[in-house]
Amino acid sequence: DHPEWRGKPLIVGGDADSRGVVSTCSYEARRFGVHSAMASAEARRLCPKAIWTHGHFDRYREVSAQVMAILADETPRVERVSIDEAFIDITPGRFAPEDPLLVARRISDRVAGLGVTCSIGVGCNKTVAKIASERDKPFGLTIVRPGTEQRFLAALPVSAMSGIGRSAEERLRRMRIYTLGELSRAPESTLASIFGVNGERMRQRAQGLEISEVTSLDEEREVKSVSNERTFAKDLTERGDIEAAIALLGESVGRRLRRQGLTGATVTLKLKYSYGSGRTAQRRLPHPTDDENIFVAVALELLDNIWQDGMHVRLAGIGMSDFDHQGGIQTDLFLSLIHI
């Protein structure tokens, strides 16, 4: 949202004059020693020329939803960990037909198109993928091929592995275990005496042998709707631009419908305007479909119901619903537009 801030020290947090705390900061600010949870007054002392701003959490959630939807375009198996982190399963022949590196590059390019950075790690399990994603932030893409996990992990400090905090790291240091390679070779009995049943799991993870599945929150629930929306950096005012945006969003919805084996009978078009309010329009189709050529054409007809010349469109969305499921629990899958 502020391209003029790029490359400059930026701090997000409370005011330094009111006992505020740093929520996060740019990499440029981190070079001065600033970090999250630091007192704002201390951060200002370390980096007096930093740009300060308060958190805009509605915007963060909006962009997060756009990123998660990009992931959902690639695979139905998306496990969201936090607002800015997710695991996805792109195992060739299982959920994705291409080499994982090609998929990862495409995701990276699409996320960059949103104006945000992402770092991607690709591996055979969550531990390896997460550590790989930390390698070259903020634009990194690191792939660890099958069979190379131990070599990749061996020289890294034990703190590189999630779940090993300061307390566990200190106990490992007392055992003269400093790297993941050393942890992978530690006797099982020794680790069990200190960490109990978690000791063996720690060792397996350090060996790169963890078995972990990506689990979607909606995996065993019935999908109620599949939708895609986008907030525009600049309001759309021309009908042609609005129609093009709806068509592009519809292509993504169509791909996801086909990937999940769904056909929908109701089309929903959603617009939000520059002054904050919004409207939706719906139409039921004579037959369920997963073909965007069909439901996008209907959405464009619905445009006349909720838009007129002169209206400034800030957000557009298109969705399909009314799927024919048998049993299950219904939940919305309204993904508007990663471990990333």
Placement of each model-derived feature along the sequence:
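Gly/Gly-Pro- and Ser/Thr-rich, intrinsically disordered tail segments characteristic of DNA damage-repair
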Residues: 1-204, 217, 255, 330, ...
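Short glycine-enriched, charge-decorated loop/helix-capping segments at active-site entrances
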Residues: 28, 284-286, 334
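Short Gly/Ser/Thr- and Asp/Glu-enriched loop/turn motifs at secondary-structure junctions
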Residues: 81-85, 123-126, 262-266, 311-315
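DNA-contacting surface of Y-family translesion DNA polymerases
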Residues: 160, 168, 173-313, 325-329
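Aromatic, loop-rich ligand-recognition surfaces of beta-strand-rich domains
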Residues: 322
